[in-house]
């Protein structure tokens, strides 16, 4: 059943949009959802931002509003085609999140929105290491993704959602301590906040590295 609904959500943009709207109601809607990982970040013109796994540009638009130079990366040419229409002021690169085609210390901020739960544990490790590599010293990795609920009332809706639209990797992520993985890769978590009964996590982590 998950395969059918996942296929529909990727094949038909209106299905994906509907699911996104419904899934973000518990944090105040899509706009609020996409702003959560960016709170208290001073993004400004002159900075360079990577929107990792940007999809159709749903979050890219909020990054672009800052006036920063925004690059969106995604593995899907179809998704990138939609992103170019939705957010033409950004530039786009087709590539894999676990094999970032960028140089050392190229970005001030790397952002990703509900993408890490699509990755295997090995891919997740590679992504975190790659993000650390492409960030400038002191650069920020900002993310929002699924989390194991702390309030039992949120288990049924999360389980239904994951059963319909997600795969085993989503279950693996909610049982993974992202903070520890980030720490091991050379980050310091400067902010972590849980929303929707603990079913969503927002993390901002600073890259600890020196200028070469």
From Swiss-Prot:
Any one GO MF annotation of this record: methyltransferase activity
Transferase as UniProt keyword: yes
A GO biological process held by the record: methylation
SUPFAM superfamilies, alphabetized: S-adenosyl-L-methionine-dependent methyltransferases
InterPro entries per UniProt: Methyltransf_25, Methyltransf_Superfamily, SAM-dependent_MTases_sf
Protein name: Uncharacterized methyltransferase sll0829
Keywords: Methyltransferase, Transferase
Family: Belongs to the methyltransferase superfamily.
């Amino acid at each position: 059943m998950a395969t059918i609904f996942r296929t529909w959500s990727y094949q038909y943009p209106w299905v994906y949009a509907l699911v996104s709207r419904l899934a973000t109601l518990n944090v105040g809607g899509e706009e609020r959802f996409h702003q959560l990982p960016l709170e208290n970040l001073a993004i400004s013109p002159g900075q360079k931002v990577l929107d990792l796994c940007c999809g159709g540009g749903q979050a890219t638009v909020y990054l672009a509003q800052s006036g920063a130079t925004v690059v969106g990366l995604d593995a899907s040419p179809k998704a990138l085609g939609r992103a170019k229409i939705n957010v033409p002021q950004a530039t786009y690169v087709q590539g894999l999140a676990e094999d970032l085609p960028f140089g050392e210390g190229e970005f001030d901020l790397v952002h990703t929105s509900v993408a890490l739960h699509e990755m295997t544990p090995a891919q997740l490790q590679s992504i975190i290491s790659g993000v650390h590599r492409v960030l400038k010293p002191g650069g920020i990795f900002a993310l929002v993704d699924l989390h194991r609920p702390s309030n039992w009332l949120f288990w049924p809706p999360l389980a239904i959602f994951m059963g319909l639209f997600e795969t085993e990797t989503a279950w693996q992520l909610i049982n993974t301590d992202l903070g520890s993985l980030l720490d091991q890769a050379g980050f310091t978590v400067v902010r972590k906040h849980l929303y929707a009964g603990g079913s969503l996590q927002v993390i901002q982590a600073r890259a600890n590295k020196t200028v070469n």
